[in-house]
Amino acid sequence: MKKTIGLAYRFFYLNNNCDFYLLFLAPFSLFNLGVMVASAVISVVYNNQPQLIWFTNFDTFTYQSNTIAAVCVLMYLCKRRCKLFDNNALFLSAAGYLVFTVIFFNLYVLSRVTGFVNVEEHVKGWFSTITSEMPYSFSGNPLTDWISFAQLFLHVIYPASFFGFIWIFFKTYKMREPLHELGKFLLKAGVYPSLYAFYLQTVPFLKIWDNGHDSYSVYGFFSQTKYNSYVWFWSIPIFASMFLILWGLFVINNRYYGAKTKYGKQ
């Protein structure tokens, strides 16, 4: 009974704009997770490859950063007094991961539109994030249109809605426990990107779909560390840019949202 009352209180006793926005973003986050699961299942069925539920789908930074953001929103809805939300570090980290996703995928889209990067037909059906079709293009084919919708949703629509929540959240509550130590924040926030970078660089050596000339890599040619020695020239700067983004968000957060407000600590 107490849990039921608490749930009703959560949904109907709205304190501020942040709470109102949360009512929209929470189901939107569930839909976000549904889009990823549906895309992975479609990939499995279309290619008759059960392992694609992970490979090319949930092992991409796009899926993982969107999952982290959605889970953070749902956790905050259910357990906003959790110690993880005593300061803004968790939301700031999730926002950083999504910023990275948005920037680099849309740079890839721009490179495709301008013709700077061309992807061969043979990658179709193997890489959900790098396909032979032009990103965000709708042709009337249900399969390719779903891929385009999922790309648009995961790289533009949901990140924009999450960034809107972050802005309202920071503006409403500001710093309940200010983040003074940049190094400590980067160390904690950088754990996940570091682990992911390790996975990205090592998975081509695991002999997954390895024919002696090519093997599975999450982003095809761009992350093929086994058969493409030039990968290291751009992978190191890209990895460093993740920390640059986190640093920028830390500075912006402390600069504009550092003072406590009348809302105080929840």
Swiss-Prot record:
Domain of life assignment: Bacteria
Regions that span the bilayer: 22-42, 90-110, 150-170, 185-205, 232-252
Protein source organism: Mycoplasma pneumoniae (strain ATCC 29342 / M129 / Subtype 1) (Mycoplasmoides pneumoniae)
Keywords: Cell membrane, Membrane, Transmembrane, Transmembrane helix
Intrachain disulfide bonds: none
Main location class: membrane
Keyword Repeat part of the UniProt annotation: no
Membrane topology: Multi-pass membrane protein
UniProt-recorded name of the protein: Uncharacterized protein MG133 homolog
